[in-house]
Each structure stands twice: as C-alpha cells, then as structure tokens.
Amino acid sequence: MERGRRMSYISPGEQFNVVDLDEERTRISTLLRNRGYFYFRPDYMTYQADTTLVPGGHISLRLIPVPGLPAAAQRPYYVGDASVYLFGKNGEAPNDSMMYKNLNIHYYKKLQVRPNMLYRWLNYQQFVRNAQMRASNRTRLYSQYRQEQVQEKLSQLGIFSYLDLQYAPKDTTAVCDTLNVTMQATFAKPLDAELELNVVTKSNDQTGPGASFGVTRNNVFGGGESWNVKLKGSYEWQTGGGEKSSLMNSWEMGVSTSLTFPRVVFPHWGKREFDFPATTTFRLYIDQLNRARYYKLLSFGGNATYDFQPTRTSRHSITPFKLTFNVLQHQSEEFREIADANPALYISLKDQFIPAMEYTYTYDNASARGIKNPIWWQSTVTSAGNLTSVIYRAFGQSFSKEDKRLLNVPFAQFVKLNTEFRHLWNMDKNNKIASRVALGALFAYGNATIAPYSEQFYVGGANSIRAFTVRSIGPGGYHPAESRYSYLDQTGTFRFEANVEYRFRIFKSIWGATFLDAGNVWLMRKDEARPNSQLELKTFPKQIALGTGVGIRYDMDILVFRLDFGIPLHLPYDTERSGYYNVTGSFMKNLGIHFAIGYPF
C-alpha cells in the first residue's frame, strides 16, 4: 500500500475534487483485490472531511472503512480448482469432457485447443520465480491483475469470439477462503479476411489504385497460432505526359506468408512468459516491381521477429534475423542511359543480399488511464551486413573491405535509424489537432557506400506531404530535367517531415480537415549526378517542401475513408521564380488528390 502511494490521485495542496476522491477509492480497492481481497469494493470506503482542523480554506480528509463491512471483504481468498466450458462457434453446448491434470475441460464434439495451453494460463498464479513463494499458499492468492492478464491473453489468441472468467466460493461455509474458477468461451470462426484499397491521383503525374487481400487461419496447431497469407498489388499510369506509350507503365505485386506463435519459440523462457507476454513471427515474402520501359526488381526473403509488450503502453519488436535478396531484371536501354549518368542509382538497385537485424520500440498511451491527449512514438534501428562482416573479419579479411560477397553476391552494409512522433490534441468532442514529426537517417559504409534502393527514404503521397505524389521531390534541391525519370532517383538517405492537421466535425461521422505538410529527403554524401542533393545546414530551410490543403473524412470508428486535396506552397528546387512562393503552373495542374483508408497519422 505504501509503495503505491506515489500513484495517489490526492495530494496535499491540490484543489478539492470529488472525481479524484472516487478515483482514489478505486485505486486502493484495486490494490487490495490484487492481494487476494476478492470481495472488496470501492464503496466499502468513505471519507471524513473537516474544514476546522486546517486553516486557510483547506480540508482535512480521512479515508476509513464503512460501518458494517462484510466479513468476506476483510479476508484474502485463494484460487482453487478450475473448469472450462467450450461452446461451439454457433453456441452449441458442450457434450463431452476430459480431465487434464486438475483441469476439467468440457467441449463440443472435438477439443479444438491443446489442454496444456489452457492449463498454463488458468494456473498462471502458480508460476512465480521465487521458490519460497511457490512453496507457500501465497502463490495462489487471487489477483485482479492476473485475472485480467489471463482474460486479455486468451482473447488475443483469436480463438474465441466470447470469453468470460467467473470466480465463486468453493463451498458455502462461513470460513471458506477458496475460489474456484470457471471459464466459459465460444469458439470463433477459424478464418479471418482483410481487404485494403487505396487510390492516388494527380493531374500532372502518376495515378492508379492499389489493393491487398489477406486471409488468416487462426488456431492452426491448437495453441493459438495463426497462419496468414497476403496478396498485394498496385499499378500506375502516366496522365498528361503527352506520350503515346502504354497507359499502364508501372506495377507492383507480391505475396507473403507468416506464422505467428503466441509465445517465444526459441529460446524457451519457461515461466517468465507469463510475466512478459510475447509472440514469435516467421515470415516469407516475394515482391515483383515493374517500372515499364526501365527495369524489373525482384525481392524475396524472410525474417523471424519477437514482439514483447511488457506494459499497456510499451512494445518492443526484435528481429534478430532478416534476409532479403534483390535481383535487378530486364534493364532497358533507357534505364542503362540513366544509370550511366547516375551510377549511384544503378549500384543501389543491383543484385545484392541485405542481411539485417532490427529493433523497434513503440510507445502509445492512447489506452492508458486518464489520458486525454495521447502521444505515439516509434523508433527503429536497423543494422545490415555487420554480423556478416564480423564473420569475414574472423577469417582474416578487413572489416572495411569493399565487395565482400555472400553466396557470390555482394551484400549491403549500413545502419538505419527511423523515428516518428505523433500527438493528438482533443480540444473537445468536435475539434482535434493532430501533429507529427518524422526523422530518418541511413548511412552505408564498409562493404558498400551506397545503400540499397529499397532501404532509402522518399516523401510525398497520401500519408506524407500531400501536395506532392510519391517520389516527386528531392533529394534536397535536386530536380530532374526529365520529369518522367523523377520517381527513379528522387530518394535519399536523410528524411525530415512535419505535419499538422486540424480536424473538425461537420455532421455526425463526417469530418473536415485542413492541413499543413512540410519535409524532404537529402543525401548524406555528395552525388555529382544529382546536384544540390546533399544535406547542408545553410540550404536546409529553403529545401524543405511545403504544402497545404483540405480534406473530408467519413469516420466509422473501425474504418475511415479519406479524401484529401493538396496544393504546394513552396518547392525545394529552383523554379526561376523569386520569393518563397515559387510554384509555377495553374492551380489544377498542381492540385494533388488522394483517396485513402485510415488517417495519415
């Protein structure tokens, strides 16, 4: 109780507030329920207030138990036997049963889950690290926190559409201090499907739709495992280009499959997994990118990822193994001409392995208690090729030697940092201000001084600077003489973005928005083929692209349809027009239109 005092809602000198008093009773009640006092409730405490004891308009408060406190609320309870009742996906009542250790399981027709999985979680309170505590009954004290952990963990498995845990006294005697647990659950349908659609258009650039479709098979091996297969595709065509080439000049398609386990598969954590829930995901994928008249890029690979969520607000994702192989195919004469003029572009696209490790930390307090204006922060660090280079070093080769190979193919070596911060200010129920800042840096070294094209940064599009399409600006103040080549080499190794958006309710689920977007990408190293592209402090401010616009959203809570109209205010390159507003051309020519699903940030 004393250790939890720092979380108190009441502090000396603060303004008297009835809401805070109720929150304090709830906090203390939760502390007691986490220590076995199952029947204790906030209403079993009351305040005594006195304004005469403390002068100066202050109130002396004393929190005391209510008179006639029930005897059941004054003693701790222990967890006893457990029973499970599993209903069919259409609500069919159990018609069979089995005993697993001391767990009685009732099910319909066929048991669709492994008994040991249910046993582990319903006996969660027995799994503690301290051997002395395990030897005593203290390990079986009822805990509201552990009840919520068990219920949340089992719900997240995707096995059940309904789940409820009920605790009841073992018998009706006055001295009974044991609670038996009954779990009731209804199986969910084994398959989930997901469809995503996206359309981007701009009157003087690229336009086209994209889509992805995924199917997930839940509870593959009876322990909450899920298997996902996802197909994705998109294509773009040139509008207003004045060329008589094929309308469809770019497309991308791919397929991926992943298998997720609701625990750490390797190494085995044993009892610690109950205090530190985690998942393990194995993923394989293959993507084909076609840039018509230029090249095709085939990428395939796989990774293993551990996800940990030790608290409600923090999440860690560790990828100790991630291997990608890029293959450049079907190079056209036009592309070779561009590559000859820009060797860095060709090097970033050529055949290469990307052996990487990755760590991501995410902080999201939107679901935390008492948070009105939530923040979201995510940072990712990626290291590629370093472990492979260490192995080469062990065999006598220099760590910094270039053109080292893996299976006779060069491999990339770089360090990449990406961080993004978001804040949502809820002014009232009809007005909100959302903001975002994003930074990224990519530094290639050792085996290759040019980072892979697929790892480089770009800006523009429906979720970035909405006055510009994807890869239509940057790096820095560079602007290709041939606009049709722009999306090939308008990437960079340093990224900065800042956005602010005012959202206002128009009518019920219809929201309007006005926004201001800024940002660009730059190169960390000088590139003679792309002048004015290097990151420099003196040119940084004027090379930040700026755009504004308005939008409309249909917010159904679980799904948001969004239509944004963006217009540039400042271009990061020289347009031969003086002043900060250096945009040329008509309003309609520069208007960017984006239709998307979900908020941009």
List the predicted regions and their residue ranges.
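C-terminal outer-membrane beta-barrel translocator/porin domains of Gram-negative envelope proteins
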Residues: 98-108, 198-205, 317-504, 514-538
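Interaction-mediating elements
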Residues: 1-156, 161-168, 178, 269
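Flexible, small/polar- and glycine-enriched "cap/hinge" segments at structural transition points
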Residues: 519, 524, 549, 553, ...
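Membrane-embedded beta-strand positions of outer-membrane beta-barrel proteins
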Residues: 195, 227-231, 282-284, 377-381, ...
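C-terminal soluble interaction/assembly domains
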Residues: 129, 137-140, 535, 548, ...
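Hydrophobic alpha-helical transmembrane segments and adjacent short intramembrane/lumenal linkers
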Residues: 493, 508-510, 543
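Gram-negative/organellar outer-membrane beta-barrel architecture
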Residues: 2-5, 11-14, 21, 41, ...
